[in-house]
């Protein structure tokens, strides 16, 4: 076996392993927050807003009143002023897994994959949002300083 033939399978294994690791959803919560960002890249507030209002992504407007949106839900707290009430670390935990703060929360666990009920086979083991998407949403929520 030549060196070239030995390297190709090793590279394939590394690529597959990196893809599995990229889907890993570990985070360390401290109290009511996740102090460390989930990614090395900072969140992008514009992308975060897009995720929040997109019904195929975050779908936050189904339950929350969202500043600037005309159609929204009213069964969850309004998001106006949330950036003044909560730190980015607190926002991160609420987006990742709100049940860590309130066990009765109906909010989806956007970055949790275990302990969930009635998950379609195609979505098992996959978070609703990627780590970068969580950081993007947190970046946008942190900009919401005004109560209205």
Label for each model-derived stretch:
Residues 19-22:
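Sec/Tat signal peptide C-region and signal peptidase I cleavage site
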Residues 112-148:
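C-terminal capping alpha-helices of c-type cytochrome domains
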Residues 61-100, 106-120:
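Gly/Gly-Pro-rich "capping" loops immediately C-terminal to redox-active cysteine motifs
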Residues 24-55, 148:
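Electrostatic cytochrome c docking/interface patches
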Residues 8-17:
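Bacterial N-terminal signal peptides
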Residues 55-59, 67, 133:
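Short pre-active-site segment immediately N-terminal to redox-active cysteine/selenocysteine motifs
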Residues 46-50, 89, 93, 135, ...:
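Solvent-exposed, polar/charged alpha-helical surfaces in well-ordered, non-transmembrane soluble domains
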